[in-house]
Amino acid sequence: MPHSSSGAPLDPVAFIHSQIRTVPDWPQPGVMFRDITTLLQSPKALRILVDLFVERYVDAKLDYVAGLDARGFIIAPIVAYELSVGFVPIRKVGKLPYKTCSESYDLEYGSATVEIHEDACRPGDRVIIMDDLIATGGTMMAGRNLLQRLGAVVVEGAAIIDLPDLGGSTLLRNAGLPIYTVTEFAGH
């Protein structure tokens, strides 16, 4: 277990939570943006975060870690590397060069689409899907649907942050996707 500068054992979840910056009224008034760049800038925080995910999934017999565009691309490949499994990108529409499968989902105002290469995984492959944050759950649900369409077994959805007041983690769990998040923040 990591230790604080005083030598006392460090609560890794509380430490990760403390490393996330809140930016009020960004990108629009009323939004409290949870900025993970401060967490990523700290080698200690990044190591603790990666270790939390690796400890959770080391015995899960995974084939891949899938990351959601864009901030899921930051942590998912590191976790995949540490677990000695492959990384699968799930991208915004029009960003992948090969044949793709796509899935649209609703946003608060409008919709969006994500894609995956049609050969990204095989039937029966065990995959976790990662993002930085779960808000409404739409992106992770779309990613799960794409992976399942390719025949993958989606073991769990994982994120650094949950915003439970927005209902995404509940929506995902109710749809049968187990969810793991390191920390949560009230509000949005």
Curated annotation (Swiss-Prot):
UniProt cross-references to Pfam families, sorted A to Z: Pribosyltran
GO CC terms: cytosol
Keyword Transferase annotated: yes
GO MF annotation terms: adenine phosphoribosyltransferase activity
Disulfide linkage: none
Compartment list: Cytoplasm
Catalysis: reaction(s): AMP + diphosphate = 5-phospho-alpha-D-ribose 1-diphosphate + adenine
Biological processes annotated in GO: adenine salvage; AMP salvage; purine ribonucleoside salvage
Keyword list, A-Z: Cytoplasm, Glycosyltransferase, Purine salvage, Transferase
CDD domains the UniProt entry points to: PRTases_typeI (cd06223)
Family matches, as Gene3D superfamilies: 3.40.50.2020
EC number, as in UniProt: 2.4.2.7
Pathway: Purine metabolism; AMP biosynthesis via salvage pathway; AMP from adenine: step 1/1
Quaternary state and interactors: Homodimer.
Family membership: Belongs to the purine/pyrimidine phosphoribosyltransferase family.
PANTHER family membership: ADENINE PHOSPHORIBOSYLTRANSFERASE (PTHR11776), PHOSPHORIBOSYLTRANSFERASE DOMAIN-CONTAINING PROTEIN (PTHR11776:SF7)
Reported function: Catalyzes a salvage reaction resulting in the formation of AMP, that is energically less costly than de novo synthesis.
Name of the protein in its database record: Adenine phosphoribosyltransferase
